[in-house]
Amino acid sequence: MAKQKTDPNYKVIAENRRARFDYAIEQDLECGIMLEGSEVKSLRAGGSNIAESYAAVEEGELWLVNSYIAPYEQAKVFKHEERRRRKLLVSRKEMADLWNATQRKGMTLVPLVLYFNHRGMAKIKIGIAKGKKNHDKREAQAKRDWSRQKQRLLKDHG
């Protein structure tokens, strides 16, 4: 497995690795996320999952639905709900673009990466995506296999 360069400007908390396999990502954008105090502490401890979540535009606002943030053990009184809907923060222009994108047939909003930026703010990268069919997934897998095989051949034979 090849090493990936790590960007010192942000720390990845959770990544939706299935998203790039299940969806064809057309465009992505960074959103802020409204969190409670215990949620931020839980994220810093690394307890989250965005693999089964999605974003939805409702009544002119963008929401992250079904994302999991583990309960923070030291929070006695102000505990948060693990799978509550969380509001995402985007500009009005970006909101209009997202709404127009979701109105097209087959388009959806998929969370890709949840991270802390260089200022320590929790951010989430949302992708405007179209679901792949099974044959598309097989084609992509075949291309990846072929490129790996080419790299091995070049490495072995010079």
Swiss-Prot record:
Family, as annotated: Belongs to the SmpB family.
Biased composition (Basic and acidic residues): 136-158
Keyword terms: Cytoplasm, RNA-binding
Location of this chain's protein in the cell: Cytoplasm
GO molecular function: RNA binding
Biological process, per Gene Ontology: trans-translation
Main location (coarse class): cytoplasm
Region (Disordered): 130-158
UniProt keyword Cytoplasm present: yes
Protein name stated in the entry: SsrA-binding protein
Functional summary from the UniProt entry: Required for rescue of stalled ribosomes mediated by trans-translation. Binds to transfer-messenger RNA (tmRNA), required for stable association of tmRNA with ribosomes. tmRNA and SmpB together mimic tRNA shape, replacing the anticodon stem-loop with SmpB. tmRNA is encoded by the ssrA gene; the 2 termini fold to resemble tRNA(Ala) and it encodes a 'tag peptide', a short internal open reading frame. During trans-translation Ala-aminoacylated tmRNA acts like a tRNA, entering the A-site of stalled ribosomes, displacing the stalled mRNA.
GO CC annotations, alphabetized: cytosol
